[in-house]
Amino acid sequence: MLNEFKQFIMRGNAIDLAVGVVMGAAFTSIVKSIVTNLIGPIIGIFAGAVDLSSLKFSIGPAVFKYGAVLNQVINFIIVGFIIFLIIKAINKFFKKNEKKEDAEAESEVKLLTDIRAELKKSNQSTNKA
């Protein structure tokens, strides 16, 4: 059972996932800091509050902290956009490699077709003689 677990952990997918989770957590903390310390104050200038998370309204005893939600929405949009850009770049990279492989495959098919034609000619001339 220990060996099976070791094989599972050492597979590329599990390691890639672990690295992705750690990088995602680090990236999220950076984006959160940027939103809280840079973007939030800029928006806060126009909203009338320096700290967006302090924006709130009350209805009776209920307090609605919409500033904190606004911070999280901005975080989500930034992280989502950057992930979109990363995936777009990865797809573009794989598409270029796929085109190269297709071109190589086409040249291999042409070469094999030419070899087959020559073998047919060779067999026909051998059979006639």
From Swiss-Prot:
Transmembrane annotation, as ranges: 8-28, 30-50, 67-87
Topology relative to the membrane: Multi-pass membrane protein
Compartments it resides in: Cell membrane
Gene Ontology molecular function terms on file: mechanosensitive monoatomic ion channel activity
PANTHER family listed in its UniProt record: LARGE-CONDUCTANCE MECHANOSENSITIVE CHANNEL (PTHR30266:SF2), MECHANOSENSITIVE CHANNEL MSCL (PTHR30266)
The family this protein is said to belong to: Belongs to the MscL family.
HAMAP family in the cross-refs: MscL (MF_00115)
Protein name as annotated: Large-conductance mechanosensitive channel
